[in-house]
C-alpha cells in the first residue's frame, strides 16, 4: 500500500457533504403537531492539516406555530416558557431562513454539494427541522432529506457511551449539567464532540484512507 491519500479538505472528508450541527428544543415528540421552541446551528471547518473544528453559530428562540401542541411534560423538562416575552422568539420562517442561508454559504465556500445534519439522536432533530421547513414553505432546504450523522451512534462506537453528557466526559470534555437542554449549549457540546471523534479517528491513522499502489 502507498502513503495515505492527502485529503484534507472538508469537501473530501464526507464525500461532498457539509456537516452542520443542530439541536432543537421542542414542546413534545411529534414533529408534525408539537411546537419547535428553540434551535441552534453550528457549521464546521477544517484547517490546512485536515483537523475539524466548529466555525459559525446561529441560535434562535422560536414562536410556536399556529395550532401547535405544547406538552406540559416537555416544557417542564426543558424549562422553556413559550409565553415569556423576554425570549425574543422569532417565527419558524425567520429562524430557518437565516440558518439555511448560513448553511448554503458554507456549502459554496467549502466546495461541498449538500449539507448533512449532525445531531445527538439525530432522527429527532432532523424530523423537527424538516417539518418546520415544510410549514414555513422554505423550498431551498440545503439538508439531505434523510441522511444524518448521529453522534449518539458515533459515541457508542468510539467512546462506549450514548448519552451526550457521558460521551463528552468520556472524550475528556467538560459538560455542565445545569446548562443541558439549552439548544445553544447542547449544540456547542455536540459540535465539539463530533469534531473530537472525527479528529481522534485521524490521529489513530484511520483517515486519510490508504490507497493501493499503482501496478
UniProtKB/Swiss-Prot annotation:
Cofactor: how and how many bound: Binds two Mg(2+) per subunit. The active form of the enzyme binds two Mg(2+) ions in its active site. The first Mg(2+) forms only one salt bridge with the protein.
GO terms, biological process: DNA replication proofreading; tRNA processing
Protein family: Belongs to the RNase T family.
Molecular function as annotated in GO: 3'-5' exonuclease activity; magnesium ion binding; nucleic acid binding; RNA exonuclease activity, producing 5'-phosphomonoesters
Record's signal peptide: none
Active-site residue numbers: 181 (proton donor/acceptor)
Assembly and oligomerization: Homodimer.
EC number per UniProt: 3.1.13.-
Taxonomic path: Bacteria, Pseudomonadati, Pseudomonadota, Gammaproteobacteria, Enterobacterales
Protein name: Ribonuclease T
PANTHER family in alphabetical order: DNA POLYMERASE III SUBUNIT EPSILON, RIBONUCLEASE T
Summary of the function given for this chain in its UniProt record: Trims short 3' overhangs of a variety of RNA species, leaving a one or two nucleotide 3' overhang. Responsible for the end-turnover of tRNA: specifically removes the terminal AMP residue from uncharged tRNA (tRNA-C-C-A). Also appears to be involved in tRNA biosynthesis.
Domain Exonuclease: start-end pairs: 20-194
Gene designation: rnt
Positions of the record's site feature: Important for substrate binding and specificity: 29, 77, 124, 146
Co-factor(s): Mg(2+)
InterPro entries registered for this protein in UniProt: Exonuclease_RNaseT/DNA_pol3 (IPR013520), RNase_T (IPR005987), RNaseH-like_sf (IPR012337), RNaseH_sf (IPR036397)
Any Gene Ontology CC annotation: cytosol
Keywords: Exonuclease, Hydrolase, Magnesium, Metal-binding, Nuclease, tRNA processing
SUPFAM superfamilies per the UniProt record, alphabetical: Ribonuclease H-like
Origin superkingdom: Bacteria
Positions of Mg(2+) 2 binding: 23, 25, 181, 186
Residues binding Mg(2+) 1: 23
